[in-house]
A protein has these predicted regions:
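Compositionally biased terminal segments of proteins
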Residues: 1-204
């Protein structure tokens, strides 16, 4: 999904839907939720406690990027819990430009038709070295290897987030582990330098 070049390309409603995706996902992971860390464009929403008009509004995001502990992919129970949770949320594997299904990028639509993208990231230098590439899998779920992304396991904050669950299943509150200012900045710098990734409008 192409990232907007300006602030106007984002909407608060879409960002709130991304928040709903995150809370719904964590709600169904049980003890494994503690192995999931938010990075990417949704993170600044929780790094800055002040809200407008004290500070400029958070521009928003179009997807949810999470770094997962590799144990989720290697532990049978954890893997099946994640797989079942994605299915319950209506997620399916997204496709790349060549129409190939991806094991690390998933998508679903909300009740009002908004397309939600979830990207699973991991740091596995012993498997993929320093390359940004999908990790091998024998199933349908894997993660995109992002070198150094595991720094978020040590450099993170915890924020309580309340959101309406997908599927009109009520409202829930979850404790979200997310990158702190140091790890967020480092990972964004790495993405810009190593992958020539286009940053969100508010990150430049």
């Amino acid at each position: 999904m192409a990232k907007p070049a300006t602030f106007d390309g984002y909407s608060d409603e879409y960002t709130k839907d991304c928040e709903r995706v995150l809370v719904t996902l964590l709600r169904g992971l049980g003890p494994w939720k503690e192995s999931v860390y938010l990075v990417g464009g949704l993170t600044p929403r929780y790094l800055v406690a002040a809200r407008p008009p004290v500070v400029p509004a958070h521009a928003g995001t179009l997807d949810v990027d999470i770094v997962i502990d590799l144990q989720i992919l290697t532990d049978t129970d954890a893997y099946h819990t994640l797989e079942e949770n994605l299915k319950k949320m209506g997620f399916e594997r997204a496709e790349n430009d060549q129409k190939q299904k991806l094991s690390w990028r998933w998508q679903t639509r909300t009740e009002h038709g908004a397309l939600m993208i979830l990207e699973l990231l991991a740091d596995a230098p012993e498997i993929a070295g320093g390359k940004v590439q999908p990790l091998p899998t024998e199933g349908t779920i894997s993660a995109l290897n992002i070198p150094h992304s595991s720094i978020v396991f040590d450099l993170y904050q915890v924020t309580e987030i309340q959101a309406e669950l997908l599927g009109e299943n009520g409202v829930a509150t979850e404790k979200v582990r997310h990158a702190n200012l140091v790890s967020f900045t480092c990972l964004k710098s790495f993405a810009f330098d190593q992958r020539n990734e286009r940053l969100n409008a508010f990150e430049t």
